[in-house]
A protein has these predicted regions:
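Terminal or standalone catalytic/regulatory effector modules within metabolic enzymes
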Residues: 54, 64-77, 81
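Alpha/beta enzyme core
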Residues: 2-5, 38-66, 85, 89, ...
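A short helix-to-beta-strand connector/capping loop
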Residues: 27, 92-94, 201-203
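Short catalytic-loop micro-motif centered on adjacent basic/acidic residues
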Residues: 67-70, 98, 241
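N-terminal active-site wall of soluble small-molecule enzyme domains
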Residues: 73-99, 103-115
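Short linear motifs at secondary-structure transitions and domain/linker junctions
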Residues: 4-10, 72-75, 183
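N-terminal amphipathic alpha-helix/helix-capping segment at the start of soluble metabolic enzymes
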Residues: 2-45
Length: 241
């Protein structure tokens, strides 16, 4: 038949996709809901306090266990007031997360980042520490990748000592696509460092994103299926400890 080769190729492609879906069904996944964080792109107006509460209550109705509830800055945001009300209401904070920078400024690694400081004052315990590994604003010959690893270790220790010994600490590889393209060795060095920490010191997990819109889902998927996910699953995931 003239279409035998085409039919065979289509069948093989479908079989590969079915294998991927079968693997997904067996993975022990968590959902970290990010609905409360406001978008910085295409948003006409900010959230009100009432908006925050409505979103939070709807997310809880969905049954999601892990929820991101804030992103802080030096200015007072709606997030600050919302978190104060949330904690004062007696809400369980053990599975609530908030974003924080890893450093206060490029040339200031000593000051506790405002995100961590606000988490301490508001009573949150689970930080998502955001890092960039391919940015030019850092002189990587002066502040080396080993310095970044050391700083992450210090932030993790601070969080467990100051926020809670049971803190579920996440590290977000914020510029993951650019790091994979331009600074793959630096990226793997950091991930390998985090994964090689003793079980009691490791982060709860790693996050990564594609915030630029420059890369197709297939590209990010290929990276996810590669070395980075090996490190994440084998070393870092809390589910294996």
């Amino acid at each position: 038949m003239p279409f035998d080769d085409v039919i065979k190729e289509v069948g093989e492609s479908i079989a590969q996709e079915k294998c991927k879906r079968a693997r997904l069904k067996d993975l022990d996944l968590i959902v970290l809901d990010n609905s409360i964080r406001e978008s910085t792109v295409g948003q006409l107006r900010g959230h009100t306090l009432e908006n925050k509460w409505k979103i939070y209550n709807e997310v809880k109705k969905c049954g999601f266990k892990f929820i991101i509830v804030a992103a802080f800055s030096h200015m007072t945001r709606v997030d600050d007031t919302f978190l104060r009300e949330l904690v004062d209401s007696g809400e369980d904070v053990s599975n609530l997360f908030a974003f924080t920078e890893v450093m206060e400024a490029v040339n200031d690694t000593k000051t506790t980042p405002v995100g961590l400081s606000k988490m301490k004052s508001l009573g949150l315990i689970n930080p998502i520490i955001e890092i960039d590994l391919a940015i030019d604003s850092i002189n990587w010959e002066v502040f080396t990748v080993q310095d970044m690893c050391q700083l992450l270790s210090e932030r993790i220790k601070w969080s467990r000592q100051t926020l809670s010994p049971n803190a579920k600490i996440m590290v977000n590889l914020r510029d993951f696509p650019d790091s994979m393209v331009y600074q793959m060795e630096r990226l793997f060095t950091v991930v390998d460092f985090l994964g090689s920490l003793p079980a009691t010191e490791r982060p709860f997990g790693l996050l990564f994103e594609e915030p630029t819109g420059k890369f197709l889902p297939e590209e990010v998927g290929a990276w996810t299926a590669g070395k980075i996910i090996y490190f994440t699953l084998f070393y870092v995931t809390h589910l294996k400890n």
